[in-house]
Amino acid sequence: MHNKIVEVLETLGIDLAFMEYEGNSNEYIIFNIYNEKSNNFADDDNLSDVYYIQINYWFKSLKNIRNYEKIKDLLKENGFMFDGAKDLKDNGYYGKNMDFIYINYKEEN
């Protein structure tokens, strides 16, 4: 799942980090999976896994405020379900915290 998130978000050309950002860019994205569970059981085997993903988009200039919509739309286009967002502010950066849900269906054998 981590690789899928990276593959999708890298296309934006914005610095990307898992859990913690150590760079010095004026805008960057941090992501993490805050919950993961098996789902849709049949014959004692799960048919899918559900991932709960947090995306934090940080930016210094308010001219970038709409980029969070690009992030949201891109993830939705790639099968992620948007589950809410809130505004952030920390250490001179503005931010947008976004939650997504992704259901990964296991392939039939």
Could you tell me what each predicted segment is?
Residues 1-41, 60:
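Small/polar-rich, solvent-exposed N-terminal microdomains that initiate assembly or binding
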Residues 4, 25, 42-47, 88-90, ...:
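Compositionally biased, intrinsically disordered low-complexity segments enriched in polar/Pro/Gly
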Residues 5-10, 67-75:
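Short amphipathic alpha-helices in soluble, non-transmembrane regions
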Residues 22, 38-40, 51-55, 75-81, ...:
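Short, surface-exposed linear patches
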Residues 45-50, 71-73:
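Short intrinsically disordered coil segments
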Residues 49-61, 94-104:
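Oligomerization/assembly interface segments of phage tail-like spikes and tubes
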Residues 69-109:
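Acidic-leaning, charged glycine-interspersed low-complexity segments
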